[in-house]
């Protein structure tokens, strides 16, 4: 069988993996698996419905039910945790490279095991992946590394963060600010956890202005899950 990864590249993660270019003909008779995508509007490649069978694997609330088969588990920290559980339970042969990427997915979605979604099962499955042969230290060090311009943007966020008496915080990143720091919307994902390092902050939102004037909102919480 032939397996292709379809979708848009995330610029900050291309060091880890890049998407494949897929012709329309590849969808003929294909099994399409959509991961970590709660609603159809967020699916990168709109050809997802052109295959023979569609599976949804996700850990967000199942508000948009789609697919011929849907596996949604809101108790999981991530789609990576779910896939790891499936591989372990069914005793699939898991390559070292696959284990590395799944481990990175769990680390990323749990904020390095800091978020409330981290369970005992999450840690057991991460340990199972860690038993595979990949450079754990290099991977996690790379995931924790930021460019100088992102570091400067993080400083701006700390300087301009508004925090109320309930521990709710917000900061607005306008197009002007993005241009000043030479940062794209996608690159702001690297600083989404920054406000959470402040002891008086319980939940926070980062409002990123888009080129068309709309805002992308990144919401996070230390205690209560946000979906």
Task: Indicate residue ranges for each PLM-predicted region.
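Hydrophobic helix-and-loop "lid/oligomerization" segment in the mid-to-C-terminal part
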Residues: 1-14, 28-29, 108-226
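N-terminal small/polar loop signature for handling phosphorylated ligands or for N-terminal nucleophile
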Residues: 1-48
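Short, glycine/charged-enriched secondary-structure capping and boundary segments
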Residues: 18-21, 46-50, 68-72, 120-121, ...
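Solvent-exposed alpha-helices and their adjacent loops that cap or buttress functional pockets
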Residues: 25-27, 47-49, 63-64, 94-96, ...
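Structural motif
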Residues: 30-33, 53-55, 203
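Short glycine-rich anion-binding loops that position phosphate/pyrophosphate groups of nucleotides
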Residues: 37-40, 60-62, 175-176, 210-211
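A short, gly/pro- and small-residue-rich
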Residues: 44-61
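Short alpha-helices
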Residues: 57-125
């Amino acid at each position: 069988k032939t397996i292709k990864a379809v979708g848009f590249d995330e610029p900050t993660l291309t060091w880890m993996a890049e998407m494949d270019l897929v012709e329309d003909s590849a969808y003929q008779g294909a099994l399409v698996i959509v991961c970590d995508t709660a609603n159809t509007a967020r699916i990168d490649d709109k050809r997802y419905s052109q295959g023979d069978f569609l599976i949804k694997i996700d850990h967000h609330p199942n508000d948009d039910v789609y697919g011929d088969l849907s596996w949604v588990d809101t108790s999981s920290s991530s789609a990576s945790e779910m896939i790891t559980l499936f591989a372990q339970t069914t005793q699939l042969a898991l390559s070292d490279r696959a284990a590395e990427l799944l481990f990175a997915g769990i680390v990323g979605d749990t904020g390095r095991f800091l978020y409330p979604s981290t369970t005992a099962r999450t840690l057991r499955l991460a340990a199972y992946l860690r038993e595979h042969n990949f450079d754990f230290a290099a991977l996690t060090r790379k995931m924790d590394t930021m460019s100088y311009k992102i570091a400067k943007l993080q400083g701006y966020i700390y300087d301009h963060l508004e925090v109320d008496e309930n521990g709710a915080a917000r900061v607005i990143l306008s197009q002007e600010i993005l241009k000043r720091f030479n940062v794209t919307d996608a690159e702001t994902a690297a600083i989404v956890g920054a406000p959470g390092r402040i002891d008086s902050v319980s939940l926070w939102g980062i409002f990123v202005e888009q080129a068309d004037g709309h805002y992308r909102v990144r919401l996070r919480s230390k205690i209560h899950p946000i979906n």
